[in-house]
Amino acid sequence: MAYTKIALFAAIAALASAQTQDQINELNVILNDVKSHLQEYISLASDSSSGFSLSSMPAGVLDIGMALASATDDSYTTLYSEVDFAGVSKMLTMVPWYSSRLEPALKSLNGDASSSAAPSSSAAPTSSAAPSSSAAPTSSAASSSSEAKSSSAAPSSSEAKSSSAAPSSSEAKSSSAAPSSSEAKSSSAAPSSTEAKITSAAPSSTGAKTSAISQITDGQIQATKAVSEQTENGAAKAFVGMGAGVVAAAAMLL
């Protein structure tokens, strides 16, 4: 809390004398270190071999440090106008604990100052145009939907043409032409009843063909039988005639 108050009042004093942020941070580091380690500064100033003396301390720093050690109010802030900020920058590197205490504290203050200033400068990303450019997915969705429509429409039209045209024409030709011409030729070319039976039975099943052939075979057998009977009857009649002639000749001879 005390360090915060020191930093606050140092900042006020620096602003009053138009000091830079780096000088304000250096003053804050010196004031806090003098307040916390006042005896070390007195001992260092008393050692002639250290190269550091009370006379070499920046104006106003020792007075403010001593006032802070026993301060009960903020009256010590009136001493800020007496601070030699150029001497403060030089004093930082003169003390033997600069690298162990002052430099880390100064870097810490510079880091806090840069981080506290960052939000004001980082307000620009909030106005980023990235969200507005995210409307692009709508255009990609539109293209995908149009592609889906075109891709789904094309197959249906081509399939409709192929399925409606080719089979109907080929079936009509095959069903109307071939059977009628073959049947007309077979029916008009049949000269006899036997051939008519054969041609009429041809388009039927295998059983019909077999029955027609058997009928033809039976007719041939009957014809052969009739011829053989006629032959046998003729031979018998001829033999009987020949016998009668022989008997008549014998009678005449007697």
Curated annotation (Swiss-Prot):
Identification of the protein by name: Cold shock-induced protein TIR1
GO cellular component: cell periphery; extracellular region; fungal-type cell wall; fungal-type vacuole; side of membrane
Lipoprotein is among the record's keywords: yes
Site positions per UniProt: Covalent attachment to cell wall glycan: Q220
Spans of repeat PIR1/2/: 210-224
Highest classification ranks of the organism: Eukaryota, Fungi, Dikarya, Ascomycota, Saccharomycotina
Region entry 5 X 6 AA approximate tandem repeats, Ala/Ser-rich, spans: 114-143
Gene Ontology terms for molecular function: structural constituent of cell wall
Gene from which this protein is expressed: TIR1
